């Protein structure tokens, strides 16, 4: 079995398991977080198709990410978590799914849903199997400790990174995921990993982020693409978020729910050049 060692343990989050658990709990209880560690529902109560989560170092974006995980905990453990992130390394094809593997973190190993990966490759003409795109990519890896903290080893993952992030590719990917999961009868949730505007002053970033979040909440992928270009908003993972937007619309939803927005300036205190973060729930209608 292919094993993917952690690429950013010790940088984005602690390499020591006890320290990592403490930082996850700090994220939940932080003033910018939900304010408490969630109780995980012992039974599955699916209330969403997925969530948007940030992917910076935990000390910066952990409290915002915690909002999505707090709400997911209330839904109980899904069978499969499809985690989609942007391709920061430039390696691999346009859309890459990780081959069957175990992803190691300081909290243990997370197994891929091998059957779901196989089915996705069978039904999709946009997804290719590739390891190189995933070897050093942090946007998926940083989600795993939160999932492990909540659900232990009861879930499997389908890790996907997008190098091409247009609305049309996002729609094709959404259709492929939905078809593959329905063919297998999977109970699944989609996590869209993305940060928002990068490296501008706090006030400008908040302004730009709100323009993007308005389109995200209104489930308008094409509108999101337009405002990103028009206002030069450096959101790194619009494609993964568009997948959840299209998926929510497929299920008849009209709006997503903004759970929390903040910037790295809110957590670090340095507001001169910040990155924006949001937690968004894509609810079942």
UniProtKB/Swiss-Prot annotation:
Pfam families reported for this sequence: Memo
Gene3D superfamilies from the UniProt entry: LigB-like
Name this protein carries in UniProt: MEMO1 family protein Igni_0992
Family matches, as CDD domains: MEMO_like
InterPro entries, alphabetized: MEMO1_fam (IPR002737)
Family as reported in the entry's similarity comment: Belongs to the MEMO1 family.
HAMAP family: MEMO1
């Amino acid at each position: 079995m292919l094993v993917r060692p952690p690429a950013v343990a010790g940088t984005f989050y602690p390499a020591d398991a006890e320290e990592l658990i403490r930082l996850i709990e700090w994220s939940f209880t932080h003033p910018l977080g939900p304010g408490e560690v969630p109780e995980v529902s012992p039974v599955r109560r699916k209330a969403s198709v997925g969530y948007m989560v940030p992917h910076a170092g935990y000390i910066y974006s952990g409290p915002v990410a915690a909002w999505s995980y707090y709400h997911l905990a209330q839904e109980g453990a899904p069978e499969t978590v499809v985690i989609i992130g942007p391709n920061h390394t430039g390696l691999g094809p346009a859309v890459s799914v990780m081959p069957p593997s175990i992803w190691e973190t300081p909290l243990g190993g997370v197994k891929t849903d091998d059957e779901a990966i196989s089915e996705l490759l069978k039904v999709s003409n946009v997804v290719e199997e590739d390891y190189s795109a995933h070897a050093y990519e942090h946007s998926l890896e940083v989600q795993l400790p939160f999932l492990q903290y909540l659900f232990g080893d009861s879930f499997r993952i389908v890790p996907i990174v997008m190098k091409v992030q247009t609305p049309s590719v996002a729609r094709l990917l959404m259709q492929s995921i939905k078809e593959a999961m329905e063919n297998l009868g999977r109970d699944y949730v989609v996590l869209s990993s993305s940060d928002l505007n990068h490296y501008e002053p706090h006030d400008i970033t908040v302004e730009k982020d709100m323009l993007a979040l308005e389109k995200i909440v209104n489930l308008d992928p094409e509108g999101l693409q337009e405002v990103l270009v028009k206002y030069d908003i450096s959101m790194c993972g619009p494609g993964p978020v568009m997948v959840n937007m299209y998926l929510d619309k497929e299920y008849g939803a009209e709006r997503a729910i903004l759970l929390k927005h903040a910037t790295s300036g809110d957590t670090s205190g340095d507001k001169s050049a910040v990155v924006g973060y949001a937690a968004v729930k894509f609810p079942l209608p």
